[in-house]
Amino acid sequence: MSIRRSVLVAAVLCALSVLCAPQGQADPSGAGGGGCRQGSVMTGRLVPGTGSAGQNIRRAATLRECVSSLLPGIGAGQFSVTIPWNAPGATSAATFAWSDGSVSAATGFGNGLWLITDGPASGHGIQVDVADSWNGWYYSYADVAVTSATFLS
């Protein structure tokens, strides 16, 4: 009986050390390609388009405190995309208009992960992170807070 109790106590202590460890906030300027540490509320509104019922969702958010070797001299940007409503497999074209006047074009599937295809950071992926575990890019036009944007490659 004491072996079982010892194993149980060890398992509980191990789980508690993982669960109680301080949870850090993503730091886009750390390891990797950097990114933007803050974002605004990402707006969403229905517009005529190619999605279900002939509707698209237009989204826009401001990205601030950008620090990355992929964005030299750039401190902020404006993210915008139009996503076909209720069409999760459809690709979308997004733009990042940067504070130095340059523009990056990107493609993605409306899940927050975008591949930059032209302009600054071309060839790299960027994840636009939102406050909740939200999966509403193409299902909902509700506004949602953007917490950061992080380069993944």
What is the role of each PLM region?
Residues 10-11, 55, 143:
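A short, structural micro-pattern
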Residues 26-37:
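Cleaved targeting-peptide boundary
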